[in-house]
Amino acid sequence: MLTLGLESSCDETSCSLVQNGKILANKIASQDIHASYGGVIPELASRAHLQTFPELLTAATQSAGVSLEDIELISVANTPGLIGALSIGVNFAKGLASGLKRPLIGVNHVEAHLYAACMEAPATQFPALGLAISGAHTSLFLMPDATTFLLIGKTRDDAIGETFDKVARFLGLPYPGGQKLEELAREGDADAFAFSPARVSGYDFSFSGLKTAVLYALKGNNSSAKAPFPEVSETQKRNIAASFQKAVFMTIAQKLPDIVKTFSCESLIVGGGVANNSYFRRLLNQICSLPIYFPSSQLCSDNAAMIAGLGERLFCNRTHVSKEVIPCARYQWESACS
């Protein structure tokens, strides 16, 4: 089956062609326009998706060496995300599905991040613990199989990627700051600042306190939002970045062994943009004795290959397929703890 995947949940537009799980083309267009604003502007994101989809679709079909008529299924990210951005993708998908007379399936963007690792590791062991870490999400799932996701825990405030971007801004790094902060942290002393990992009861996470601790480290007692940041040496910036990175990832890592045991998980699947962080990958391999599956770098960021892959799998299994594909900004998962 040849499946077209479409992704537009936030600020990256993507078109991909996947055939029976094999990626033939995966085109991604990032929106640099948001950098000057220090964050994603939803209206600008929607406009960029609208302008980019047609040319990106052409590039994907040419790269894969196929025509539109060869497409057998259209899979689109329809939740969760920015409602305007999702609507652009869903409407574009509906137009194609109607014109080509092809079936259309909606795919959960967060679930697709976890499925991305399964695409590259067909022998993934289940049940698995799924960890989705990105700019907008930090969630834990029990995965009895590759297409079932039961919520175990989530962040109670900021997502981990959002926290990275905010701390990067404190350090004067340009948006998006996550990768730049990781690069800065490589040259720093992770033990220079005693940022304590947040401890939240149960299976949830919290990152707001850690963000505030970094603010105090930079501003001292004058941590008012209006107070200017004092001059900080490059050495101190590197040390703060390294100490923050260690603490923020320990916030997650310290919970995993007990959760794996409680839910009898046989593997750990990690997905999302933050899953590309090399420090976190090393940390997980140190503390977890079970198999760990990460997507390749290209499949960590928002992309349509994961949308096409999961959509194709769901369609072939005839599971979780709704008759109407509707964009939805939020999604409520069934709990694994009920």
From Swiss-Prot:
Q: By its UniProt entry, which InterPro entries does this protein fall under?
A: ATPase_NBD (IPR043129), Gcp-like_dom (IPR000905), KAE1/TsaD (IPR017861), Peptidase_M22_CS (IPR017860), TsaD (IPR022450)
Instruction: State its Enzyme Commission number(s).
Output: 2.3.1.234
Q: Which cofactor does it need?
A: Fe(2+)
Q: Name one GO cellular component term.
A: cytoplasm
- Pfam families xref list: TsaD
Q: What biological process terms from GO does the record include?
A: tRNA threonylcarbamoyladenosine modification
Which positions in this protein are listed as binding Fe cation? 109, 113, 302
- Positions contributing to substrate binding: 132-136, 165, 178, 277
Question: Can you state which reaction this protein catalyses?
Answer: L-threonylcarbamoyladenylate + adenosine(37) in tRNA = N(6)-L-threonylcarbamoyladenosine(37) in tRNA + AMP + H(+)
GO MF annotation: an example = N(6)-L-threonylcarbamoyladenine synthase activity
Subcellular locations according to the entry:
Cytoplasm
- Could you tell me what the cofactor note in this record states? Binds 1 Fe(2+) ion per subunit.
Major location, coarse class?
A: cytoplasm
CDD domains given in the database record: ASKHA_NBD_TsaD_bac (cd24133)
Per UniProt, which keywords does this protein have?
Acyltransferase, Cytoplasm, Iron, Metal-binding, Transferase, tRNA processing
Q: What the protein does? A: Required for the formation of a threonylcarbamoyl group on adenosine at position 37 (t(6)A37) in tRNAs that read codons beginning with adenine. Is involved in the transfer of the threonylcarbamoyl moiety of threonylcarbamoyl-AMP (TC-AMP) to the N6 group of A37, together with TsaE and TsaB. TsaD likely plays a direct catalytic role in this reaction.
Family, per entry: Belongs to the KAE1 / TsaD family.
Q: What is this protein called?
A: tRNA N6-adenosine threonylcarbamoyltransferase
- UniProt lists the gene as tsaD
